[in-house]
Amino acid sequence: IGYPNDVESIVEAAETLLKDDNVHFLFIGSGAKRRWIENSVEQKRLTNVSLLPSRPRDDQGNFLNACDVALVSLVSGMEGISVPSRMYNIMAAGKPIIAITDPQSELALAVEEENMGWVVPPGNADRLVTVIQEARAEPLRLAEMGSRARKAAESKYAYVHVLQSYLSLFEKS
């Protein structure tokens, strides 16, 4: 939960969706923006937001299996600099992704190329709320996106495929 993450849009969306009992936000981890989230949740009385401390990577599957959709966020200007590694774990778990990121980022391109979720521009909490409501209203579409995410994880990002990509890169050198 660091500076590259657009947590502000997520907290704003949580405030808008506060009365929707079917939507809950879970932040796991620590980082530079965690205190800001804690303060915002307390000040705004966001009962639909939970914060947990960092957990062992072995526990990640439990949390991913408990969610319907996962949020991955990056502030503007991160394209070409960062792809959150959690994206690959989310894909492997077969979960659709709501990517809060610039439309030209690697994260956005992967989500759109695989049709495994939605892309929301950073700072656009209203669009995030709309996407969350769409996702909640379409469980079959969520399942299809999750299935595509899992297939992409297996066919493009599994260790054997990544290793082969590196090997072919070195063979060309």
Where are these regions (language model features)?
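A conserved mid-protein helix/loop that constitutes part of the nucleotide-sugar donor-binding site
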Residues: G2-T16, R35, N89
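Nucleotide-sugar-dependent
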Residues: N5, P56-F63, A70-M91, P96-L109, ...
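A structural motif in glycosyltransferase catalytic domains
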Residues: D6, I10-A13, F25, L128, ...
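Nucleotide-activated donor-binding/catalytic signature segment of Leloir-type glycosyltransferases, i.e.
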Residues: L18, N22-G29, R34-G61
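Amphipathic alpha-helical segment in the mid-to-C-terminal domain
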Residues: R57, A125, L142, S155-L163
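A short, well-ordered alpha-helix in the C-terminal region of glycosyltransferases
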Residues: R127, E134, R141-S155
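C-terminal alpha-helical cap of glycosyltransferases
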Residues: A137, S155, Y159-S173
